[in-house]
Regions:
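Surface segments flanking catalytic/ligand-binding clefts of nucleic-acid enzymes
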Residues: 25-262
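Hydrophobic alpha-helical segments and helix pairs
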Residues: 1-27
Length: 262
């Protein structure tokens, strides 16, 4: 799934250390979900095609960063598999700012990282801004670093205000939300409650999440899935634990390598 986001996004992971290595940003997407889907259909019964099709259902075009991709995948992943089952999402769709605000100096558009399709709610991954503030000022260009961090912080605040003026509530997601037990659970439930209040959603799409989000056994398993995806060394161990658990439960444990030159 995460490889799909990378191939269809504007970043690449370190080929030698994809989990913890540095990512490169601002690259052209290698392909897109539609073209991969066409290839899978063309491949027919080739080994791994069905597994690839299942994975592709959780991939969306135009992710701008690995962490954004992780949050999007978890939002799409069913609760039975350790995700949140929030329905469809869209990534980095540009929203035009009201002309009246642009005339007062606001940016002419803003781009929320993730939107819950059919709602006015979304997410922005804001990373480790406060750590950067604490670390800036220690080097030769500390003053410039601190000013840059401050400018980014202020722009994030203005971004959220301007999106709110467009009728969109965009919740920040931090690295602490992902690493802390049930931290992301709280953010996702907040998004659901806002969507129900703001968009008057009554189709039951969020009923499962609200019913199951507080169950301790599911919270623990879901957090283990989250930890298995994150860019830190223990992630490999959590991923192996989950694979071993699936194998013991009778799921086939296989690694399918498919080279797709689309």
């Amino acid at each position: 799934v995460l490889l799909g986001y990378e191939r269809c996004g504007t970043y690449t992971r370190d080929a030698r250390n994809p989990r913890c290595g540095d990512a490169t940003f601002g690259v052209q997407p290698a392909t897109n979900v539609g073209r991969i889907s066409d290839f899978i259909e063309y491949a027919g019964r080739i080994r791994g095609a069905q597994k690839a099709k299942q994975a592709l259902a959780l991939v969306r075009d135009n992710a701008w960063s690995p962490m954004e991709a992780i949050v999007a995948a978890l939002a799409l992943l069913p609760m039975s598999e350790g995700g949140y089952g929030l329905g469809d999402v869209a990534l980095n769709r540009r929203q035009l700012t009201a002309p009246e605000l642009v005339s007062l100096g606001c940016k002419d558009s803003r781009v929320p990282d993730i939107e819950l399709v059919g709602t006015h709610v979304g997410f922005n991954y804001d990373g480790r801004v406060h750590f950067a503030v604490g670390e800036s000022g220690t080097g030769q260009d500390g003053g410039a670093d601190a000013a840059s961090v401050r400018a980014k912080y202020l722009d994030d605040l203005r971004r959220n205000r301007e999106l709110a003026a467009m009728g969109r509530v965009v919740l920040p997601v931090t690295s602490e939300d992902l690493f802390q037990q049930s931290g992301l659970d709280a953010v996702m439930l907040e998004a659901v409650l806002i969507a129900e209040e703001l968009d008057h959603i009554e189709d039951g799409r969020f009923d499962e999440l609200k019913a199951l989000i507080g169950m301790p056994v599911l919270q623990r398993e879901r957090q283990r899935v989250i930890w298995s995806l994150l860019p830190w060394e223990p992630g490999d161990a959590y991923a192996r634990q989950i694979a071993d658990q699936l194998a013991r439960a009778g799921h086939p444990r296989e690694i399918v390598t498919t080279v797709m030159d689309i």
